[in-house]
């Protein structure tokens, strides 16, 4: 196996969770500017598309990264072991430092086809996928949930995953059925760690679910002795979630991150065409907590280009500056 970067990380380490249509190279660089985590994962990349002669072009943008993002982990999904084997070799050649297997996506058209969290119901296939993914020599990790239907599934399922000799297991502390509709089951962390210690003490344990920031993650790590913390939706409420010394951030700083996002979108659009509409989901992250925020968000949602968005920001910030001088 190539160098296992997981073994060199600080304890606890912090990861930005892979999120579909969110954690692309643009947003990862914005987060890095605000407060960098220890590890970045890509967006979800489908193994079948990657292995298809034509499909490879459709996933290229999902696998784009730069050297300053290392250690970079490719987050991939599917259900055919031979495709994971082929893709693992290709990802190693591309310079990724690790491969993370999606066994937790709850979306119906994924899970009900036996992929993502659907693999919880197909444990033997899950094991075959894990072993096949080691072909490229990269450390293999898994992101999953407590179970599919019921929380009581967690022990048998996680025991099975721990037995596969993986580098890291990230657990979203909910079942597939629960989606994100209930509080994450932090009460199970201690028992899960005990199981890990018994079955696979060399496998790192990362916790995910309802963790808003680094400080909360540190509290959980100190309380339970877990190795890593993964933050997902918390980044939407606070782009500075990974900040080591938290402080209040001004609206100017947030709008500055939005300007950076626009510039990076423009930069990487030259390499890989990106749809401007995909930017709209990010506006609410940066435009909030200030007078006129609702109106500005509404206006930004109706823009059709980077130039239009910048013009709106220029006008809005000029008004902000004028009010502050009164």
From Swiss-Prot:
Annotated positions binding FMN: 18-20, 143, 208-210, 232-233
The enzyme's E.C. designation: 1.3.1.-
Pfam families in the cross-refs: Dus
UniProt KW keywords: Flavoprotein, FMN, NADP, Oxidoreductase, RNA-binding, tRNA processing, tRNA-binding
Disulfide bonds: none
Keyword Oxidoreductase attached: yes
Named cofactor requirement(s): FMN
Top EC group: oxidoreductase
List of catalytic residues: 105
Catalytic activity: a 5,6-dihydrouridine in tRNA + NAD(+) = a uridine in tRNA + NADH + H(+); a 5,6-dihydrouridine in tRNA + NADP(+) = a uridine in tRNA + NADPH + H(+)
Signal peptide: none
GO molecular function, one term: tRNA binding
Secreted listed as a keyword: no
Summary of the function given for this chain in its UniProt record: Catalyzes the synthesis of 5,6-dihydrouridine (D), a modified base found in the D-loop of most tRNAs, via the reduction of the C5-C6 double bond in target uridines.
Family: Belongs to the Dus family.
Protein name in the entry: Probable tRNA-dihydrouridine synthase
Organism expressing this protein natively: Staphylococcus epidermidis (strain ATCC 35984 / DSM 28319 / BCRC 17069 / CCUG 31568 / BM 3577 / RP62A)
Lineage: Bacteria, Bacillati, Bacillota, Bacilli, Bacillales
